[in-house]
Amino acid sequence: MTQRVRTRFAPSPTGFIHLGNIRSALYPWAFARRMKGDFVLRIEDTDVERSSQEAVDVILEGMAWLGLDIDEGPFYQMQRMDRYREVLAQMVDSGLAYPCYMSTEELDALREAQRERGEKPRYNGFWRPEPGKVLPQPPAGVKPVLRFRNPLDGSVVWDDAVKGRIEISNEELDDLVIARPDGTPTYNFCVVVDDLDMKITHVIRGDDHVNNTPRQINIIRALGGTQPVYAHLPTVLNESGEKMSKRHGAMSVTGYRDEGYLPEAVVNYLARLGWAHGDAEIFSREQFVEWFDLEHLGKSPAQYNPEKLAWLNNHYIKVGDNARLAELTRPFIEALGGKVEGADLVGVIALVKDRANTLKDVAQTALLFYRGEPQADAALKAEHLTPEIQPALKALATQLGALPEWKREAISATFKAVLAEFGLKMPKLAMPVRLLVAGQLQTPSIDAVLELFGREAVLRRIGAGVEA
């Protein structure tokens, strides 16, 4: 019987999660969904000083926004300390781990001497029990660390789904500290216990964990566990070619939401940031899950391209449901001081969205419908609301007022009739109308704008300009 696929995302809640971090959630999520398996969230919060619930909330919020639903968790490592201590005790009892009383000063001196001899700095196994070896009496009052009894010969081998076959000689690995003097377990130990207890079959994570992998595999083997499949993802680089990080200007995942990006655009972009399905650039979440595999993960670092993300976001805005976009855009309009009343917001979105890269862009254009009575620049009024144009404006207002139906086509036909009657070109009449109705010279198509403003508002505003 084939083992059920189980993947995990195991972030540290230290206050910031950027696109590179969340990609390490997206890929295991997609693989679990593709394989009809389980996606587990584990919060690695053993760094008590840097971890916070606020940071956990940011992680959960970002995952929820992107639709990365979890099947189990979140599990918190700090809530599993009893389990870790249980396994530590078992390892000591079975000879898989041992207490080491070497002080920090002694270890530093050892490493310095090794460096002077041109050797790789490493623990020398002084306190490691061996047949026939007589250990010194433990120093009084010194609390030991616990070290894992790493194999002395052989090698660690795994076929990484991204990097291929990797082999590390055990001679390169010293006896890893798995518990500190105060008894708290270390990162590599906790990860192994968690992955075994949670029956994780595929570990998909950043390649900064490659060096941890042989140590973790040896502990897994010692505990009699099954080694998972590893896939170590290359680094995500920022625009400057540096590793993406808060220090180098990366924005948080929820920051993209707050800037007006759609979650489907971010998911689509992240999916292609290190994985490919032929030449496909635009695909739905469902297609991504259907297509995702480990074989087509990229082997080279992926570089963040904000223009590509903006292009994708523009696409999803253009094809997006206008009612949904209206609700998502409303807060951005209100943040600009607009009051969403009068013009139908769904209709406004349909009119203005095509050239927008973000919902902020949509809101900026839509604002002309929701900022109250227009306050056009006096110089522009003087330039465009000339005495010569007044008769045409009056005629336009009269004919618009007489329309049986307030529809874009009828408004367009009325403009054409007035232009023909007075021998004018469209800009000569449209510019003053834009100023009077919208308070600005640049708007979408004038007939569509007037339709959305509504008959009463249009006639009132044109009338105010004619009377002035």
Curated annotation (Swiss-Prot):
A GO molecular-function annotation: tRNA binding
Keywords annotated in UniProt: Aminoacyl-tRNA synthetase, ATP-binding, Cytoplasm, Ligase, Nucleotide-binding, Protein biosynthesis
Xref: Gene3D superfamilies: 1.10.10.350, HUPs
Enzyme class: ligase
Location of the motif 'KMSKS' region: 243-247
The EC number(s) this enzyme carries: 6.1.1.17
Keyword Transcription listed: no
Chain ranges for the short sequence motif 'HIGH' region as given in the UniProt record: 11-21
The reaction(s) this protein catalyses: tRNA(Glu) + L-glutamate + ATP = L-glutamyl-tRNA(Glu) + AMP + diphosphate
GO annotations of cellular component type: cytosol
Superkingdom per UniProt: Bacteria
Localization in the cell: Cytoplasm
PROSITE patterns the record matches: AA_TRNA_LIGASE_I
Main location: cytoplasm
Transmembrane regions listed in the UniProt entry: none
Pfam families the UniProt entry points to: Anticodon_2, tRNA-synt_1c
Cited InterPro entries: aa-tRNA-synth_I_cd-bd, aa-tRNA-synth_I_codon-bd_sub2, aa-tRNA-synth_I_CS, aa_tRNA-synth_I_cd-bd_sf, Glu-tRNA-ligase_bac/mito, Glu/Gln-tRNA-synth, Glu/Gln-tRNA-synth_Ib_cat-dom, GluQ/Sye
Binding site for ATP: 246
RNA-binding found in the keyword field: no
Functional description taken from the UniProt entry: Catalyzes the attachment of glutamate to tRNA(Glu) in a two-step reaction: glutamate is first activated by ATP to form Glu-AMP and then transferred to the acceptor end of tRNA(Glu).
Description of how the protein assembles with itself and partners: Monomer.
Family listed: Belongs to the class-I aminoacyl-tRNA synthetase family. Glutamate--tRNA ligase type 1 subfamily.
Listed name of the protein: Glutamate--tRNA ligase
Lineage: Bacteria, Pseudomonadati, Pseudomonadota, Betaproteobacteria, Burkholderiales
